[in-house]
Amino acid sequence: MIRVMENNDLAQCGMIYSKAFPMEHWGIDWTAENATEYLQDLFEQKRFVGYVYEENSEVLGCIFALCKISGSKEEIDIHEMAVLPERQGHGIGKQLLNAVKDYSKEKGLAGIVLYTSEYAPAVKFYEKNGFKLSNGTICMYCE
């Protein structure tokens, strides 16, 4: 079942996040603790929108988004989504995305933005769920 995220969900979300984004795939050493702290920062943002997927009182997936003004339009920016690895491929991610899509439509937002790695399963998943590459946008990084 999808429901609106609550503060007391964050520890479970941090654990899920640390398992869904292992060091060997993403190059970041996420622990349940530092992931929870990171997600808490997102949760506390003024325009935060978040949902969890729950079965039998256990959170199995979560999505963290922020509404933002982009020029003359308002969009929603998905910052993070994570599903327990052993539950991936069972429609949980799709349901979480649909919750954000429904929110966007209800609020009359212009669209939904997200960034992901070129890691093929993620790109294919998002394309399958209606997302497409945005022309002229690249991600740049500096140390």
Predicted regions and their residues:
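A short beta-loop-alpha structural element at the N-terminal edge
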Residues: 1-15
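Conserved GNAT-fold acetyl-CoA-binding loop/helix
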Residues: 18-40
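A conserved beta-turn-beta hairpin within the catalytic core of GNAT-like acetyltransferases
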Residues: 68-78, 88, 134-135
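Conserved beta-strand in the GNAT
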Residues: 52, 58-67, 77, 82
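Conserved beta-strand-loop-alpha-helix junction that forms the acyl-donor binding cleft
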Residues: 113-123, 141-143
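A short helix-loop-beta-strand connector motif used in the catalytic cores of GNAT acetyltransferases and
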Residues: 40-52
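Conserved GNAT acetyl-CoA-binding A-motif
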Residues: 97, 104-117
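Conserved acetyl-CoA-binding loop-helix of GNAT-fold acetyltransferases
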Residues: 83, 89-102, 128
